[in-house]
Amino acid sequence: MAGNSIGQHFRVTTFGESHGLALGCIVDGCPPGLELTEADLQVDLDRRKPGTSKYTTQRREADEVKILSGVFEGKTTGTSIGLLIENTDQRSKDYSEIKDKFRPGHADYTYHQKYGQRDYRGGGRSSARETAMRVAAGAVAKKYLKQEFGIEIRAYLSQMGDVSIDSVDWNEIENNAFFCPDASKVDAFDELIRKLKKEGDSIGAKITVVAQGVPVGLGEPVFDRLDADVAHALMGINAVKGVEIGDGFEVVNQRGSEHRDPLTPEGFSSNHAGGILGGISSGQDIVAHIALKPTSSITVPGETITRSGEKTELITKGRHDPCVGIRAVPIAEAMLAIVVMDHLVRHRGQNFGVQTETPKI
């Protein structure tokens, strides 16, 4: 398996399985001198970890991260940062019945066909449990970006099923279990989840992630465009089936006179492009949206086959999220932070001394 790393200069490599002994990652390329403690990383991990609300999986993992290397006397040294989280609440017996069956909608069949074997305990490496390490690594990037450049990266749940938000209040997001910025929609989300639990079913969701304060100039055309790397990172999140930058697929219905973002001496008058032009950050907010599918781990019976190809039926047991989009909020933040951090380091290495006569708007 070769696809365990992301980034070029700020590079994150993860390892571990859902029911293994531990999860871990190596973060390369973090500049030296950043004050960093385990508590700094724990904040976002606590936002992602399972068992924290009645709306998500009841698997209870402390997700306490340990810094193994790369930090000395409270500051990063510039060497590889090693991070580790031990798994403590595995219930592998929940998966014994699917040892020889493929869960429809999951990676069971494709992993088996590609590798000739699979870890059926919670999906092994394909499980979203792996994203805990992305969040830990992303927290390193988020702290550096905010402390050194004033860049802030935040996300929120913008839609669950047919319930969409009408407004965004950044101060409201941490006041509810849904990371919802619209207080008027919390009860509707609550009602939807309760209904799904009774039915044993699940629902999809849409997450919006925003990077504020990103300077103009990040992105490496033509193949490492900033929007291309953002899409790559967000698409790599478990259950994500679609990514939009700015207005995304709405541009199909727009005219050029509507979509273009006029420039004025005071700044851009709109942001349909989502803060990226020609693959390079424009200085506006970077705005992206991800669509997450409804999880297939449900108690509604579904058709599948056994390892020998025989027809059978499957009811998924275990502890699962009725909507995986809820806990995907800090994951989306982490992935965007990793990409912005990587491009910032790359830009500084090549274009540090570039100056133009045109004022930055």
Curated annotation (Swiss-Prot):
Subunit structure: Homotetramer.
Role this protein plays: This reaction introduces a second double bond into the aromatic ring system.
Pfam families hit by this protein: Chorismate_synt
Protein name: Chorismate synthase
Family that this chain belongs to: Belongs to the chorismate synthase family.
Gene field: aroC
GO cellular component: cytosol
EC number of this enzyme: 4.2.3.5
